Amino acid sequence: MATGLFIGGSLLTLPTVQAKNTVSDDYPLNDSINWNLSPVWRDEFNGTSLDSKSWNIYASGWGANNVQSCYSRSEENVNVKNGSLNLVGLYKPGARCKGNEKSGNFTSGFVETKGKKSWTYGYIEARIKMPNNKSTWPGFWMSPDKPTYGSWPRSGEIDIVETKGSNLNYAAADAHWGLSTGNKKHAQGRDLPAGFKDTTQWHTYGVKWTEGKLEYYID
């Protein structure tokens, strides 16, 4: 299964995203010197617009999980400035979009690599500053480029990080799989490392994906 990246949220900012092949798998988290990684793709967002060879801007509603925003292509919602990708949520009374009957009053940004960049196994990370606005739910996650084993959740989902604007000490990692939405399974972790500063500060969130195993990292 090859997966691509999906990034959505309100005032979520990323200065870099990268994918790497893992050369060595035997070192502890704090032994950064011996982590031998060979980047296969990265985006530093150094220009003034999103790289269309790597990214799509998703523009529509999102019907799941009570999301109440319309994702927009507008530059005020998705822009690249000063070495960062900015996904911005805005109060827009009366906003409506297809795919989400609950949408209204808010617009936001959502980008994905679907159909352009995908990987099977390796290490994926991004440096992200999250919002602190109430009811925001930004995320950095991976979903199959093609539904090899069937529709969600059969083909899986890897959530590298999801946060809540109402709780700046919350950062969840997750994975979903199963035969149906009524029989889906997931594994979720919320324990944050000692000394972790709130999610509105810059942090690097990553996942190391090997056959039969997912390891999640913060900083």
Located regions from the model:
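Sec-dependent N-terminal signal peptides
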Residues: 1-5
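GH16 jelly-roll
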Residues: 20-219
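Sec-dependent signal peptide cleavage junction
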Residues: 7-24
